[in-house]
Regions:
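C-terminal regulatory domains involved in ligand/effector binding and gene-expression control
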Residues: 1-77, 164
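Short amphipathic alpha-helix segments
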Residues: 142-159
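Signal for well-folded cores of large energy- and translation-related assemblies
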Residues: 45, 87-88, 118, 122-129, ...
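Conserved short beta-strand edge segments in small beta-sheet-based binding/regulatory domains
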Residues: 161-167, 192-199
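Active-site beta-strand/loop microenvironment that shapes enzyme catalytic pockets
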Residues: 79-127
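Helix N-cap motif at beta-to-alpha junctions
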Residues: 33-34, 144-148, 176-183
Length: 199
């Protein structure tokens, strides 16, 4: 996968797993921020207030550098870590996985818990539609009106999204393009007379 793209899921997906009468209900939830993670966790804790454990893990950002896992009272590293492991094995980001456990009366042991949480997380991911997204960059170019045709020719050839445009004596256009193609576009725009980039 390119440096300017990443994989995530399109919408919430659900998984289910049972082991020795314990039920594991899992959710893969697309999220963008830690605040969204907190909101979703609160929602699932309220929805499953009667469950023994609500364990989770998340990964955020195109560089996959913001992550956390929580065992919610299960033995250390038997729940959150295996859930996070599934997010990593699918190379996903901007994703929260919540696994709810209803205890079935039989202890699963450390290795049994790890397998159960890993499998439940994998079930939710398998049910999700995975999509690749690009990391984009916005470029604002300022130029004099007589040079509009030169700018528009480049826009037509490189095909960035036009976010905003203002046509006066000094024109301004904000373009959005995939990060890997941004430098080339900037260089082409700067070759047009009177053009400069606005920070």
């Amino acid at each position: 996968m390119a440096d300017d793209s990443y994989k995530t899921i399109k919408q919430i997906a659900e998984g289910y797993y049972t082991e020795k009468r314990s039920r594991f209900i899992s959710y893969a939830i697309p999220v963008r921020t830690v605040e969204e993670v907190k909101e979703q966790l609160e929602k699932y804790r309220k929805q499953y207030y009667d469950a023994r454990h609500v364990c989770w893990a998340y990964m955020l950002g195109p560089e996959r550098q913001t992550f956390r896992a929580n065992d919610d009272g299960e033995p250390s590293s038997t729940a959150g870590k295996p859930i996070l492991g599934q997010i990593n094995s699918y190379e996903l980001t901007d994703l929260l996985i919540v696994v709810v456990r209803y205890f079935g009366g039989i202890e699963l042991g450390t290795s049994g818990l790890i397998v159960a949480y890993r499998t439940a997380a994998a079930e939710a991911i398998s049910a999700a539609e995975i999509e690749e997204r690009t990391v984009d960059e916005d470029i604002t170019v300022v130029f004099e009106y007589p040079y509009l045709n030169g700018i528009m020719r480049i826009v037509k050839e490189d095909n960035p999204a036009i976010i905003s445009q203002k046509f006066e004596m000094d024109c301004e256009m904000t373009l959005r393009i995939r990060k890997g193609e941004a430098e080339r576009l900037k260089n082409r725009l700067l070759k047009v007379e009177t053009a400069y980039l606005k920070e």
